[in-house]
Amino acid sequence: MAWWKAWVEQEGVSVKGSSHFNPDPDAETLYKAMKGIGTNEQAIIDVLTKRSNVQRQQIAKSFKAQFGKDLTETLKSELSGKFERLIVALMYPPYRYEAKELHDAMKGLGTKEGVIIEILASRTKNQLREIMKAYEEDYGSTLEEDIQGDTSGYLERILVCLLQGCRDDVSGFVDPGLALQDAQDLHAAGEKILGTDEMKFITILCTRSATHLMRVFEEYEKIANKSIEDSIKSETHGSLEEAMLTVVKCTRNVHSYFAERLYYAMKGAGTLDGTLIRNIVSRSEIDLNLIKSQFQKMYGKTLSSMIMGDTSGYYKTALLNLVGTDL
């Protein structure tokens, strides 16, 4: 399933919220769970992981009205570690959460290029527009300015190009002649010359529609006798290679891309909790069920079983609630 179709599929939603919702008793339950000495973590999980994001925002308003406190700040003061990070992530409106993840990836020493690439390469034009709006409102600078200030070279160029959101034209029309020309241009920019014309790759990958790119990839393989992925791996390296490959992966199958991100967040020693939390939270009301299905096809195990083996405590319980049942 290509990435540009993923936002209209209700069967992909793993967190649908409560059908008989009333924010006031939920807010009271949360207040009691954090009142006095000790915290009832299970009560917090039972409320917040079983409500939609819109419902959580209403609970936060009720909490403020009833008890005069900010719910997110209260949660931060009562919880800690990975569990706190997950629960607080649930409280952000979706676009503000993704803006925060981008800001956090660039603040301080070093830049988490993988986070920026993941978000920019996998979102639609409308989503990127909302993320950019939230970013500027919350941090007082534009996302494009901060990316330009924090990255350089061809990586900066591909990230800024991705921000323009030119790939989600879903008209379905593909000009076969242009697709063939693009494939020939990519081949000429890489395999046929000593060195690589990176800007040709960036321009085609970031400005053509996803349906068009699928045809380009087919034509490219006929010309080069190798996949576009193999050519990118041989012609580029580092974060630029990662960015280009992510665009290709999301064009081919966005659910496979996110399944891969989740798998490698847990594979081997240690867990990339930031990747795990971000992708489960951000996809839970979009297409997480479809990602789960793809995960099982690709790795022969369920996402739930891998979470159970790789996490623990209330953190594990909350993640499993968000993921839902694996069939």
From Swiss-Prot:
Pfam families: Annexin. This protein is an anticoagulant protein that acts as an indirect inhibitor of the thromboplastin-specific complex, which is involved in the blood coagulation cascade. SMART domains: ANX. It comes from the Eukaryota. GO terms for biological process: blood coagulation; endosomal transport; endosome organization. Keywords: Annexin, Blood coagulation, Calcium, Calcium/phospholipid-binding, Hemostasis, Metal-binding, Repeat. It comes from Rattus norvegicus. Annexin repeats lie at residues 21-92, 93-164, 177-249, 253-324. Belongs to the annexin family. InterPro entries: Annexin (IPR001464), Annexin_repeat (IPR018502), Annexin_repeat_CS (IPR018252), Annexin_sf (IPR037104), ANX8 (IPR009115). One of its GO terms (cellular component) is cytoplasm. Ca(2+) binds at residues 266, 268, 270, 310. Signal peptide: none annotated. A pair of annexin repeats may form one binding site for calcium and phospholipid. This is Annexin A8. GO terms for molecular function: actin filament binding; calcium ion binding; calcium-dependent phospholipid binding; phosphatidylinositol-3,4,5-trisphosphate binding; phosphatidylinositol-3,4-bisphosphate binding; phosphatidylinositol-4,5-bisphosphate binding; phosphatidylserine binding. Disulfide bonds: none annotated.
